[in-house]
Amino acid sequence: VVDIGVNTDKKIPGAIDRKIRMGTYNIAKGQAMSYDECVKAMNIGIEMAKNAYEEGYDILGVGEMGIGNTTTSSSVLVGLTGCGIEEAVGKGAGITKEAFEKKKWVVSEAIRVNKPNKNDPVDVVAKVGGFDIAGMIGVFLGAAYYKVPIVIDGFISAVAALAAVRINPLVREYLIPSHCSKEIGYNIAMRELNLEPMINLDMRLGEGSGCPIAFSIVEFSLAMMNNMATFDEAEINDDYLEEVRGEENYIV
């Protein structure tokens, strides 16, 4: 756990203290952070990926903890893709109808006030994102740099992954989606990444909760690929398959 912007001056037991400052600013009134602060948060994420690589980890997962950060994630998604507010904004951990309308207004106002440049992902995140998103972008970038596969968690993690891919398209080659988030904007992020989640558990929870599930599936898949016998090894006659090898025989 890395603290790069929790809104408290107290030390968090067990957390790595890399606080840039206490929280970001109100995105409905101005940009969340400076461009330099965004880059600093990304560099912290890259550093965390580097540390994990040097400690011998061969797969990483990215999650976050926060309240209200589906609002910033929706704002970043709109800023990166130009999609509509209704397509990007969901109900997060659960809110009233009135709060939902306010949430959509905040995202709309954040885009109107800040005018993020969709061609500059750092500008988008600096203006309407958060330190958590910027830090996760850095982890995705760092994982790709050190050639370590990395698991996407939920909606917020997916938006960070999309921003990282917009910075460097090669990052996509190291991404592994985990669970399908119930947040409406998640599908847009996956479509933009041209990826599909492994499983759908009707979860609207981030915080890295999908990563351990994906780790297990990856481990099982590797075990099957490395240890499962081929037809030749098992001395199975596969001549009968010649008639059905064409792709058209497998597609309904």
What residues fall within each predicted segment?
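N-terminal loops that bind phosphate or other acidic moieties
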Residues: 1-252
